[in-house]
């Protein structure tokens, strides 16, 4: 009987858990999109910081951990690359992770970089960040674009 009750409970509540998960993934996707726009394109640390969780672990070896590390990066962009702009080409959300494929141009007219950002979120807030950055080459071994 207990086994039958467990199966019935699973059948009843599993769709609701999945719907919540899909809803949370959309919340996470939107949070990362707004965070990135404020931090990188608008260079507004205060607005971007609202999307950070109680901790912010930075896995890029060239960037410091925590909100202060992000604040320093945003200030660097604002000072050295005020015209920098990034276009988010695609976004994937999977559970508590959001992945962005980005074309970043620090200096207008340059080819820029292809970037993949990976964010981990908890309760809708960003708590970890990884990235991989590759310069867009002048020539390619194939006819495909990086984007």
Would you name each region that the model predicts?
Residues 4-13:
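Sec-dependent N-terminal signal peptides
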Residues 15-50, 142-147:
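Short, low-complexity N-terminal intrinsically disordered segments enriched in polar/charged residues
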Residues 45-94:
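A solvent-exposed, acidic/Ser-Thr-rich amphipathic alpha-helical stretch
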Residues 48, 93-97, 119-127:
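Short, solvent-exposed coil/turn segments at beta-strand boundaries
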Residues 84-87, 111-117:
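Short, surface-exposed coil-to-beta transition loops
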Residues 131-147:
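Low-complexity, intrinsically disordered terminal/linker segments enriched in charged
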């Amino acid at each position: 009987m207990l086994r039958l009750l467990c199966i019935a409970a699973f059948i009843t509540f599993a769709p609701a858990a999945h719907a919540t998960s899909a809803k949370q993934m959309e919340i996470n996707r939107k949070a990362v999109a707004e965070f990135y726009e404020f931090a990188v394109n608008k260079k507004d640390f205060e607005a971007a910081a609202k999307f950070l969780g109680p901790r912010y672990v930075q896995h890029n070896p060239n960037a410091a951990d925590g909100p202060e590390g992000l604040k320093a990066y945003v200030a660097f962009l604002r000072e050295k690359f005020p015209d920098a702009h990034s276009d988010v080409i695609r976004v994937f959300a999977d559970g508590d992770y959001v992945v962005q494929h980005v074309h970043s141009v620090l200096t207008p007219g340059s080819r820029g970089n292809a970037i993949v950002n990976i964010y981990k979120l908890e309760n809708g807030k960003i708590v970890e960040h990884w990235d991989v950055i590759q310069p867009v080459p002048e020539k390619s071994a194939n006819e495909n674009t990086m984007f």
